[in-house]
């Protein structure tokens, strides 16, 4: 509170950046954690809350006749434009927000003061919900080829890896340590995902310290051990996710990429995902387009294209699809790296796992995926998200791109994810909110030093409490789809209004009024039809009679033979109109065109997997050992 000199300012206007209607007038409050604006002109009390940690920039605009404007841009893409009557009040609020939004010490972050009135035991249970050993066991590890080792328990192998890592059983301790000395920051090749169907593996690491000619026998042995852990393939891929020119430039600094002549039976491939600085610039250009007050459709589309944002999303998706196809179709193991192996590598390894394994498309599985590939493996959340007052060049929307890639997949396969768009937005918001300890720090060692697991709470129990509102009603369970094969042609990628224009009220100027009304009418009709069908199902909720249960069982068998549907376009004559949030109208009621028997089977199947997931979650929360990531 020492940073707050003016906790309350009255007669503050909140401008609507899309319309010319009269600005709201109210009172602005500054608390220890939030900026709160209370609209006094509204008939019903209306409040706008902005978490200090969500604030990306605060800008004092030139003085006007109406007062002193204050423009706030948030990391969750909320934009608030206030006009404060007195210049002195505006300056004091501006100064306070600069300090409150950019704390210097980790202990000043919201998570260390957040108190949800939860007992110490319940907090510990929350941190036990995700156990990565259980996920490795689900893959069949340990086995004859792979083992979980504690060689890094004192962080001597790599200080940004977790204490336990999965390496080939054939790799000796000397091989592991020798390889770590040849890899940037000691980030040796470790297992990310094992495809049990054919023993092909996705592994990850950082770039080698090869320069123009250096080599390392232990590193060559490590890659050989990874290749031999997959007897079904005579070769393995080594994928560098950087543009080739960037990787070659790193050679001059004594780093670079693997020389195929030094490694047996590897196939090297560059993918070409740009670095964090290009991505940061691209997002800024995208947001400038989104904030244009009255763009024409042509201007908006031109600006979207010039930002390059969707091209970068496509590049990440292309790399992930390549990994998934190499593992599934070619039965080859893949080793992935970028520069340090914690940005682009995390993106493509996690997305490839998501494409291959339906478990990661469920609530708990997605949490496990984030814990395993992002948190445990040392993605620098603190730096990339700008949690503390630091180098702005380290900030980059790497995790935002991952979340958007998942959303793009949800648009192509609306029945394959247990969760909906709001689940992704909740996670994205809390990556920046610093309300929970999961995303603080840069690696496991740093989180231990900060005593994150003793002093803060985990996000995952909080999200599970909201499971009902975050569930996708179209979800068909684990068995409906195994591997996903998305279309990555440019026209397959949509602009995500639900992310970048989420806080904009009313209709955007770039929308045609008639199209908007027609979309709303079509949506209303489909929802009414859906409501009628649900009313007809209500009698079944009391439980069917024995003979009815037998009938339903037979219906389920028949329905299982029905071909699965991917998208609404599969059973619509033409592509449905797209709503303002990026969701196609057909997605809202995709099951309305499926026969009644298939819907009953879908409902039964979804509930079965939901109950199974909850049972597993509860049992692990009670019995599992603490696994801090």
UniProtKB/Swiss-Prot annotation:
InterPro entries associated with the record: MTMR8_PTP, Myotubularin, Myotubularin-like_Pase_dom, PH-like_dom_sf, Prot-tyrosine_phosphatase-like, Tyr_Pase_AS, Tyr_Pase_cat
SUPFAM superfamilies from the UniProt entry: (Phosphotyrosine protein) phosphatases II, PH domain-like
Key word Lipid metabolism present: yes
EC number(s) given by UniProt: 3.1.3.95
Coiled-coil blocks: 517-543
Cellular compartment(s): Nucleus envelope
Catalytically driven reaction(s): a 1,2-diacyl-sn-glycero-3-phospho-(1D-myo-inositol-3,5-bisphosphate) + H2O = a 1,2-diacyl-sn-glycero-3-phospho-(1D-myo-inositol-5-phosphate) + phosphate; a 1,2-diacyl-sn-glycero-3-phospho-(1D-myo-inositol-3-phosphate) + H2O = a 1,2-diacyl-sn-glycero-3-phospho-(1D-myo-inositol) + phosphate; 1,2-dioctanoyl-sn-glycero-3-phospho-(1D-myo-inositol-3,5-bisphosphate) + H2O = 1,2-dioctanoyl-sn-glycero-3-phospho-(1D-myo-inositol-5-phosphate) + phosphate
Record-linked Gene3D superfamilies: Pleckstrin-homology domain (PH domain)/Phosphotyrosine-binding domain (PTB)
Domain of life of the source: Eukaryota
BP GO terms, sorted: phosphatidylinositol dephosphorylation
Top-tier EC class: hydrolase
Active site: 338 (phosphocysteine intermediate)
SMART domains with a match to the protein in the record: PTPc_motif
Positions annotated to bind a 1,2-diacyl-sn-glycero-3-phospho-(1D-myo-inositol-3,5-bisphosphate): 250, 275-276, 339-344, 380, 384
Subunit (UniProt): Homodimer.
Family indicated by similarity: Belongs to the protein-tyrosine phosphatase family. Non-receptor class myotubularin subfamily.
Listed name of the protein: Phosphatidylinositol-3,5-bisphosphate 3-phosphatase MTMR8
Species per Swiss-Prot/TrEMBL record: Gallus gallus (Chicken)
Upper lineage: Eukaryota, Metazoa, Chordata, Craniata, Vertebrata
